[in-house]
Design a protein with these regions (language model features):
Chain A
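Bacterial N-terminal signal peptides
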Residues: 4-15
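N-terminal signal peptide c-region/cleavage motif recognized by signal peptidases
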Residues: 14-17, 22
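Sequence/structural segment immediately N-terminal to covalent heme-attachment motifs in c-type
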Residues: 22-45, 50
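Short glycine/threonine-rich turn/loop motifs
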Residues: 24, 48-68
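Solvent-exposed, acidic/flexible segments
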Residues: 24, 28, 43, 75, ...
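A generic structural signal for secondary-structure junctions
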Residues: 43, 54-58, 87, 116
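Short Fe-S-cluster ligation motifs
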Residues: 63-83
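C-terminal capping alpha-helices of c-type cytochrome domains
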Residues: 78-121
Length: 121, 195
């Protein structure tokens, strides 16, 4: 059975379209509801303070007591590393203590956009 | 007189000792007894699960301190104060269950930060009225529920993942009560947690 030409064209366009731009405003909402149980922008809590995290080497937020694994990691937080971290922290840095996962790519992208914005990058 | 009441309240809040497991903690842990023993022999997975449980413990310790700060602030009136004390008791039971499970797995529970450290981290000095305290509690409870949901896929042991879901349900219940107390609308759409 042949698909109508118009439908094929629409599918081709959809496949070729770039991913939607990340939304930092939505990222803020997600950050507050998903990350806010343990993190704040400006205070070390269960997890480290996040302002300035984008572009920072892992394990270097001032005055936070990191796991040895994160302290010794060579990871620098940017799009790809933050995305990998939110997909599965243990896969990126075995021995870390976060273990919180964000399943949806668009949610991760928006959270990362917000962290980038709050880091002035 | 006010100070006496505050001190008695503090005694009440501090009364449930860390060393004695509550009935709920024992019940929660009872389901973990076998898996905890089995996990202890599975090194890497157990170590990761201990890490998750310790992060959860830090979160519960922060919640206990937050409710302590709220109760001692003098900003909460009855019946909100009683509800806050009850929710703090729930968090203490969570803490006790987590500590017992971490020890059962061969780990060392993380120590709690002082109330003063938590007050600074949560900017408790900015709390001026009951609504401010409820908003903080509401925010922390939602974050806690989402944290417990977000770590479920990372547990090596499915039994512990189930415990995480049970803890998330308690936090979601707290959030719902606080939301009603604040007269906020309930979520218009389903699946509002973990999203």
């Amino acid at each position: 059975m042949r698909l109508p030409a118009l439908l094929l064209a629409v599918l081709a366009l959809a496949a070729a379209a770039p991913a939607a731009a990340a939304d930092a405003a939505r990222g803020q909402e997600l950050y507050e509801s998903r990350c806010g149980g343990c993190h704040s922008l400006d205070a070390n809590r269960v997890g480290p303070a996040h302002r300035g995290v984008y572009g920072r080497k892992a394990g270097t937020a001032p005055n936070f007591s990191y796991s040895t694994a994160v302290k010794n990691a060579t990871v620098v937080w940017q799009e790809k590393t933050l995305d990998a971290w939110l997909i599965n922290p243990q896969a990126l840095i075995p021995g870390q203590r976060m273990n919180f996962r964000v399943a949806l790519p668009e949610d991760r992208a928006d959270i990362i956009a917000y962290l980038r914005q709050q880091s002035g990058k | 007189m006010t100070q006496m009441i505050d001190l008695r309240r503090r005694g009440l809040l501090r009364g449930s000792g860390i060393t004695v497991l509550s009935a709920s903690a024992v019940a929660l842990l009872a389901g973990c007894e076998k898996m905890a023993s089995a996990q202890a022999s599975n090194g890497a997975s157990a170590a990761n699960d201990i890490g998750i449980l310790n992060t959860a413990l830090a979160l519960e310790n922060e919640a206990i301190s937050a409710y302590q700060l709220g109760a001692q602030s003098g900003l909460l009136q009855k019946p909100v104060l009683e509800v806050a004390v009850l929710f703090q008791t729930h968090h203490k039971e969570h803490r006790d269950a987590l500590i017992a499970t971490i020890r059962k797995l061969g780990g060392t529970p993380v120590p709690a930060k002082s109330d003063a450290e938590v007050a600074q981290a949560l900017n408790a000095a900015a709390l001026k009225n009951q609504t401010d305290v409820l908003r903080l509690a509401q925010r922390l409870e939602k974050g806690a529920a989402n944290a417990y949901i977000g770590v479920i896929p990372s547990f090596g042991d499915r039994g512990l993942a189930q415990v995480s879901a049970r803890l998330a349900a308690d936090e979601a219940m707290h959030w719902t009560v606080l939301t009603q107390a604040l007269k906020d609308p309930l979520p218009a759409k389903a699946l509002s947690f973990g999203a």
